């Protein structure tokens, strides 16, 4: 796993995919260890698995416990170990899960009465069933993607499959079913993102490792060295290309902004700018909020648009139409527009505006306030 490109490509994204994949992996392994001495269930490992399921649920919703259940339950039933399955429902395990996961959901629902419908119904069931949401890909997308992202080790896949099919080792069966369950689960929805299949990375690599370790030692050691070098190069390229920091623009803004001034981000959200500029109130985001395609794209616009359901007054204040930028100049303070260079023409014609800062990633423009009729 540590020498697979998949691991490093996925790690560059600032989202919860790696976190929930790690927690789901920890949950499945803990539950598998809990039942490794049939017919007993080791309570300590069961509680660890319950805790990991709860944390995974907090990280990214119901898949935090649905996927571990989808892996462990059929695996035990296929071996006729239903007594252990019943013991996994130990009251202490259920209690740990509820104590960790439930309070946040309860408090959020009490604060925002529409939360349960949005989070559980829309973000799970409706989104799972939609055929046109976000990155639409064919059913076989992950079946092709997983071997591609785990090269060079996936070259051993045919032999690994043959070995897994011929053995009756429960551990091999667990890893095999684990991969099938995760890949199958995320293959049914039409929306597919690379990070979805991360919970299958560990068992996939474990299957390949068990076979490779039985083969030519010199060969796999040479491949490991080459793979490690490739991964280092991937990290180097990402580190060289990826930085798109807005820190320089933010420092200029922080030095010159007045208390009465406002900040407007134009058709883009500059995540790090409020942090570096130490802004203490919400920025205004100008975009096409009436776009009918907005609900079908999983991006920053949809996140902010969805948030207006729970804070409509604040939404009306900070989410402004892109075609009414001049109206934002009405007030007592100056207005600072933050744009990507290719969008600079949207603000260049505003009354009295001047460009204060520019680099390859960001431009900062200042327009004085004026009285409006």
Language-model-derived ranges and their functions:
Residues 1-218, 279, 360:
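Membrane-integral, polyisoprenol-dependent glycosyltransferases
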Residues 41, 132, 238-243, 312-318:
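Short, flexible loop segments at the rims of nucleotide/cofactor-binding pockets, characterized by
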Residues 53, 251, 271:
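Active-site phosphate/pyrophosphate- and oxyanion-stabilizing loops and adjacent acidic/basic residues
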Residues 129-130, 142, 233-236, 306-310:
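Short glycine/proline- and acidic residue-enriched helix-loop micro-motifs
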Residues 195, 232-255:
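Hydrophobic alpha-helical transmembrane segments in integral membrane proteins
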Residues 212-235:
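Signature aromatic-anchored transmembrane alpha helix within multi-pass, membrane-resident enzymes
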Residues 245-268, 279-373:
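Luminal/periplasmic acceptor-recognition loop/helix of membrane-associated glycosyltransferases
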